[in-house]
């Protein structure tokens, strides 16, 4: 006798229509905190998240970025097909993250990547297929020329969904992609542009 349990966790408010619910987390997905990533807004999580990607099987998989501010001093590099990077929700908030009064009750909520010193928060390598990035906020940091999400070239069947990009030099850079979907994304406060 065997049993299979699929446990569901959600980070959304419990309204009747689930309008505030962007994503769920199951026990068959990998959580980047299990690899040492810490969403404290201070610790560099680049190596931990890249280790999580390296641990995925050759056919890809799903990695979850839980709620918190995950700082990057180097890009998250996606170098496998069929990889999904999924936040629990993009944590809609204003451009101002207040410091003082105990950080005004802490981070603004949602799953946030902060490209502190990284030239890109997420870089999808040339030739990758089936890469999905969803339910995240991507914010710039101290690197003056950072890119939020960079599809480096000749990618196929990629998808960006429910992404918020803010305070970046370039929000999304896509080179030579085929069958790319961009759905429900909002990019603002950029000195450069949204897409190339």
Sequence positions of predicted segments:
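Right-handed parallel beta-helix
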Residues: 82-88, 129-140, 156-169, 178-196
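N-terminal extracellular ligand-recognition/capping segment immediately after the signal peptide
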Residues: 50-53, 57-103, 111-118, 137-138
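Surface-exposed or flexible loop/turn and strand-edge residues in extracellular/cell-surface modules
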Residues: 27, 60, 67, 73, ...
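Glycine-rich beta-solenoid repeat tracts in large extracellular/virion proteins
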Residues: 75-79, 92-105, 120-127, 145-154, ...
